[in-house]
Amino acid sequence: MQQLYDFYILHQRKYRENSLLVSVFTREFGKLSALIAINKKTTNLYQPLVKLRGQINLAKKADSLSKIYNIEFVESFYQKTYINLLSLQYINELIYLLLNYSHEEDVLFDKYDFILRNIDEANYRYLLRLFELELLNSLGQGIYVDSDIDGMSIQNDCNYIILPNGFRKDFSFAVNSISGSSLKKINQPLSSWSDDDLKAISRVTRVCVDYVLAGKQLKSRKLLVDYLNLKK
């Protein structure tokens, strides 16, 4: 019996009359490009934020596509508020743009699955930072907060300038510097983060994510920022 794999669709477009070309996120294979055969009854099933399960036949050549068959519906996460949907759209766009193809991503997949199940209006900012930090780890760009770029230990009572490759001790009291105590919270549970910690860590992940994006623009981030500005 063929094994079935859980997956989420990140992006899809029509490919010929009865097929979709999809980018999917899986635990076992990371991100994959694949073909899915469709009919009138199943077209609406293949959407982002829907957990699916199916048989995956991996592409045999680098220039060919994987195929997904015998697809089952598992669970939908569309019953969320608008801010949560924008947040999840942002996460999907990050995975779609940044994650490499065909690489096992069990930790990141489990974080993604956890966020889909648990995100709400009270915690979405925390969970977005959690995912950004895990994604950076998966990309080999994990944030190291034990020492600064000069090799000196991060001090709770000192301020630091954020750089894409680390942190530099700030002796000029710059407005955009952040405290060492907040930096160290990156390695601690979300429950230990204060509002000030969250703001500081958000600035750190913004710099690091922008660095790996290398100029790519996130449509979902703009939608999220515009929506939050309207609510002020």
UniProtKB/Swiss-Prot annotation:
Alphabetically ordered keywords of this record: DNA damage, DNA recombination, DNA repair
Biological processes per GO annotation: DNA recombination; double-strand break repair
Matches recorded under InterPro entries: DNA_rep/recomb_RecO_N, NA-bd_OB-fold, RecO, RecO_C
Name of a matching Pfam family: RecO_C
Higher taxonomy: Bacteria, Pseudomonadati, Pseudomonadota, Gammaproteobacteria, Thiotrichales
Classification via SUPFAM superfamilies: Nucleic acid-binding proteins
Keyword DNA repair: yes
GO cellular component: a single term: bacterial nucleoid
Function recorded in the entry: Involved in DNA repair and RecF pathway recombination.
Family: Belongs to the RecO family.
Name under which the protein is recorded: DNA repair protein RecO
